[in-house]
């Protein structure tokens, strides 16, 4: 190629590139002008387009045009603004037996995996589903710090929660608050959790709401300020919580504290016939909250607190039925007592328990053994709340008497798509010390069941771990 041809070739190439660049520039200018006017057509350029994707999430797309660049940002936002406070208007569902809901097998799994040492477990639900809760000991079953976890109170305990059905581990547990006594409940908008911590003679409570500490409560009697060890219940934003401070074997100071969004609305001293209150198991229906508690001082029959959350008032009495449900307890008497404790039982002064009191649809839970925390059974006892002669008409074994049980408590999925509130309960399956002293730890697994209108058979849902494998 001679020099003239080279010049012509280079010139043609340059002109071609110039034309292409010009066309690209024109296209870019047109695109930016078009986008500018498209955004400008809306009344407010900062107003996002909202596209609902499901009942719990919203996708927000923000279109912002600056300096001829268009940025599109996708934000996933929980639709808390569309939630409303839980309203306890429904009745309890009819229950003829109990079906299995969940079993975490924590001790069996912990023989090999990293599973937290826990006790005082419970379940609590929210609009998204149900979670398991427990007070962690800040160590695992195979950890050396598991030695001494038989003790209830230490600076290392925390209320943790995890997905229902899983075993609690350092990898799936969420810390709700720090302490050695707890309760937690959801009001339909956000969760309130309360933890007690500190020394026996000067403990305090910290109230969390929406993931932040909101209120602190000091000890009022200087003797182990403590609370329910299972879920509280809310109605129209008001969440009553039962707390006790004082002796475990004598008259103590119990208060019902009414919270809204973690802030105290009212405090009531315990009134009525109940003489000692600890570890209440509460549920709600028909705009009333009922708490079935533990009389650790005198009664083998359980005290009952009935709360009107709208009026923020309460009354207390004892479960009238002759079927005694605390442990330890004497043999069932000929007559119950609505107004006073029925004494007797040896050696343990009591255990956390529950009942669902709904006229003919009433159910009581108790250990099968009257002397120790072994076995567990559910008894349908019509009118147990009001009739001193009431006895069982239906019986279902939950844990056979050859296996350990422990605390038990009530919970309900108040957001389930039903015409009624279906009663549910859990049983703590304690393993390790003091009954099994060949290991250094004390921990538990959990089994949970819910009501069924069908008549289902019994089975033993015991823990099932072989302690010999931990040696």
From Swiss-Prot:
Its cofactor is Ca(2+). The gene is NA. It is a single-pass type II membrane protein. Intact N-terminus is essential for virion morphogenesis. Possesses two apical sorting signals, one in the ectodomain, which is likely to be a glycan, and the other in the transmembrane domain. The transmembrane domain also plays a role in lipid raft association. It comes from Influenza A virus (strain A/Gull/Maryland/704/1977 H13N6). Its EC number is 3.2.1.18. Residues 36-89 are annotated as: Hypervariable stalk region. Inhibited by the neuraminidase inhibitors zanamivir (Relenza) and oseltamivir (Tamiflu). These drugs interfere with the release of progeny virus from infected cells and are effective against all influenza strains. Resistance to neuraminidase inhibitors is quite rare. Residues 1-6 are intravirion. Belongs to the glycosyl hydrolase 34 family. The influenza A genome consist of 8 RNA segments. Genetic variation of hemagglutinin and/or neuraminidase genes results in the emergence of new influenza strains. The mechanism of variation can be the result of point mutations or the result of genetic reassortment between segments of two different strains. It catalyses: Hydrolysis of alpha-(2->3)-, alpha-(2->6)-, alpha-(2->8)- glycosidic linkages of terminal sialic acid residues in oligosaccharides, glycoproteins, glycolipids, colominic acid and synthetic substrates. Residues 92-471 are annotated as: Head of neuraminidase. GO terms for cellular component: host cell plasma membrane; membrane; virion membrane. Residues 11-33 are annotated as: Involved in apical transport and lipid raft association. This is Neuraminidase.
């Amino acid at each position: 190629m001679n020099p003239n041809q080279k010049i012509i070739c280079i010139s043609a190439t340059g002109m071609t590139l110039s034309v292409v660049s010009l066309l690209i520039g024109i296209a870019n200018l047109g695109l930016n002008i078009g986008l500018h006017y498209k955004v400008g057509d809306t009344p407010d350029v900062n107003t996002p387009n909202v596209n609902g994707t499901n009942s719990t999430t919203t996708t927000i797309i923000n279109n912002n045009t600056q300096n001829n660049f268009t940025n599109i940002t996708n934000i996933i936002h929980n639709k808390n603004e569309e939630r409303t406070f839980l309203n306890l208007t429904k009745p309890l569902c009819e229950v003829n037996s109990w079906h299995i809901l969940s079993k975490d097998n924590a001790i069996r799994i912990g023989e090999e995996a990293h599973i937290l040492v826990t006790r005082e477990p419970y379940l609590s639900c929210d609009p998204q589903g149900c979670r398991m809760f427990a007070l962690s000991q800040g160590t695992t079953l195979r950890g050396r710090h598991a030695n001494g976890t038989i003790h209830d109170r230490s600076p290392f305990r925390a209320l943790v929660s995890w997905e229902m059905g899983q075993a609690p581990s350092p990898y799936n547990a969420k810390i709700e608050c720090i302490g050695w006594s707890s309760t937690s409940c959801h009001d339909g908008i956000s969760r309130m959790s309360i933890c007690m911590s500190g020394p026996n003679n000067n403990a305090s409570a910290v109230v969390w709401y929406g993931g932040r500490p909101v209120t602190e409560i000091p000890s009022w009697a200087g003797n182990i300020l403590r609370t329910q060890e299972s879920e509280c219940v809310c109605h129209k934003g008001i969440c009553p919580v039962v707390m006790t401070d004082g002796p475990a074997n004598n008259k103590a100071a119990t208060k019902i504290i009414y919270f809204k969004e973690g802030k105290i609305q009212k405090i009531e001293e315990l009134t009525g016939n109940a003489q000692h209150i600890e570890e209440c198991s509460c549920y709600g229906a028909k705009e009333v909250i009922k708490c079935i508690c533990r009389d650790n001082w005198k009664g083998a029959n359980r005290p009952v607190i009935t709360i009107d959350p709208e009026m923020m008032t309460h009354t207390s009495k004892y479960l009238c039925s002759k079927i005694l449900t605390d442990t330890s307890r004497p043999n069932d008497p000929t007559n119950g007592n609505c107004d006073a404790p029925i004494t007797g039982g040896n050696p343990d002064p009591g255990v956390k328990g529950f009942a669902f009191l709904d006229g003919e649809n009433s159910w009581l839970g108790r250990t099968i053994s009257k002397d120790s925390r072994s076995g567990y059974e559910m008894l349908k006892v019509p009118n147990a709340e009001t009739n001193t002669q009431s006895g069982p008409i239906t019986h279902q074994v939950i844990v056979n008497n050859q296996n350990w049980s422990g605390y038990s408590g009530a919970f309900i999925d108040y957001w389930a798509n039903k015409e009624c509130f279906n009663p549910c309960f859990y049983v703590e399956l304690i393993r390790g010390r003091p009954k099994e002293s060949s290991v250094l730890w004390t921990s538990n697994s959990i089994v949970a069941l819910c009501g069924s209108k069908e008549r289902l058979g019994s089975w033993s849902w015991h823990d099932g771990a072989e302690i010999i494998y931990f040696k």
